[in-house]
């Protein structure tokens, strides 16, 4: 039979222990131990116990909390929290901070996303380390578009073979006339 979970795991990148430690750090860019962050986290996930459901709730919360604003000039995640505005980078930053506060190693990634208008555009989203069976795997989450494991994204700036793929995208002739937008 078809093993959906096994098939999913084979497609995800395994997380190393070093990465778990690195992507749980509290830093000026990702100050996840702040009281303000803790309060926002409680609003986002409430009393949820299931890890996957927590990620779904966080993705949905950030998508609804942050209004799309491509002119946003947020300096920190606290600016994003205060203004409730931002582009994909602000969505990803707030999600990263909240997910780390919830105990999930999380990283921002960037690359290309299909926008449904026959083009790929520069985009930022996140990857969350989730335990599946006995190991941790990077699971993509896009809080801008409220998507878990988006199939329309091509990562280019994290530790992945797909990063090399973005370099040749401009050479591909898409069947429906899709374009790469820089």
Regions found by a protein language model. Give the residues of each.
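Acidic-enriched, low-complexity/disordered segments with a strong bias for Aspartate over Glutamate
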Residues: 3, 26, 50-51, 68-69, ...
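Secondary-structure boundary elements
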Residues: 15-86, 160-182
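Extended acidic/polar, glycine-enriched regions
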Residues: 1-12
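Hydrophobic/aromatic-rich core segments of domains that either
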Residues: 91-181
């Amino acid at each position: 039979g078809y093993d959906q979970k096994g098939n999913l795991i084979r497609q995800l990148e395994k997380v190393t222990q070093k990465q778990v430690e690195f992507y749980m750090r509290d830093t000026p860019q990702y100050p996840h131990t702040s009281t303000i962050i803790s309060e926002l986290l409680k609003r986002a996930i409430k009393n949820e116990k299931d890890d996957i459901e927590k990620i779904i709730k966080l993705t949905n919360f950030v998508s609804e909390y942050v209004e799309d604003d491509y002119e946003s000039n947020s300096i920190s995640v606290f600016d994003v929290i205060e203004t409730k505005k931002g582009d994909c980078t602000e969505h990803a930053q707030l999600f990263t901070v909240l997910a780390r506060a919830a105990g999930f190693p999380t990283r921002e990634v960037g690359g290309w996303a299909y926008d449904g208008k026959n083009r790929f555009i520069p985009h930022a989203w996140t990857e969350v380390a989730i335990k599946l069976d006995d190991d941790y795997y990077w699971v993509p989450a896009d809080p801008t578009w409220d998507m878990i494991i988006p199939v329309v994204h091509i990562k280019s700036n994290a530790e992945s073979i797909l990063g090399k793929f973005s370099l040749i995208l401009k050479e591909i002739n898409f069947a429906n006339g899709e374009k790469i937008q820089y």
